[in-house]
């Protein structure tokens, strides 16, 4: 298939991966989203008993633990739970508050998945699913080549948004941990 070139690659087609890909693509970046699974967003699909606990309107930096306490302040000041709620309202997804600011879809988690897919489509995100990454090689110029079972992909940057190992039976893997180790990134 040759080498396909992208400005950014998102690895992991869950909530974080799709949101990141959508935002980058809508800002004019050429983005491809890769996942090893044939079906995207499995954790979204099962969250909240199938109704997706999609945000907590009371989330503050004090709700998060981090080696860098300012990270969460910065992240939440750039994109708040209210910003995500505005996106949900734009798509006319009915929701309700269940407990202490936790918001759930009235109908189905599929509505959030469809919303994120539509946001990716609006930016022209390319998809590679299922696609297994065999190796990540850093180039001399600072870019990367992802060697995959569907051909090599060249990129300036990679976002690893695979989540943790919380639910292996729905496809969670140690991919992010292996990449962190490969590039000597600290794990918390």
Residue ranges and their predicted role:
Residues 49-99:
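Glycine-rich active-site loop/strand segments that organize a redox cofactor
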Residues 88, 116, 180:
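Residue-level signal for inorganic ion chemistry
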Residues 6-33:
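N-terminal Rossmann-like FAD-binding beta1-loop-alpha1 element of flavoenzymes
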Residues 10, 14-16, 39, 164-166:
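Residue-level detector of alpha-helix initiation sites
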């Amino acid at each position: 298939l040759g080498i396909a070139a992208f400005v950014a690659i998102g690895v992991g087609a869950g909530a974080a991966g799709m949101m990141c890909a959508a935002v980058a693509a809508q800002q004019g970046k050429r983005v491809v989203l890769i996942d090893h699974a044939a079906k995207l967003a499995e954790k979204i699909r099962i969250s909240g008993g199938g109704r997706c606990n999609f945000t907590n309107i009371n989330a503050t930096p004090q709700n998060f633990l981090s080696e860098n306490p300012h990270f969460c302040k910065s992240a939440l000041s750039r994109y708040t739970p209210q910003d995500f709620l505005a996106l949900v309202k734009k798509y006319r997804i009915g929701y309700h508050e269940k407990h202490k600011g936790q918001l759930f879809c009235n109908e189905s988690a599929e509505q959030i998945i469809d919303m994120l897919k539509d946001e990716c489509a609006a930016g022209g995100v390319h998809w590679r699913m299922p696609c297994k990454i065999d190796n990540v090689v850093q180039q001399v110029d600072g870019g990367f080549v992802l060697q995959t079972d569907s051909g090599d992909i060249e990129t300036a940057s990679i976002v690893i948004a695979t989540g943790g190992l919380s639910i292996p039976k729905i496809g969670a893997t140690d991919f992010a941990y292996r990449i962190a180790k490969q590039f000597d990134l600290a794990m918390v």
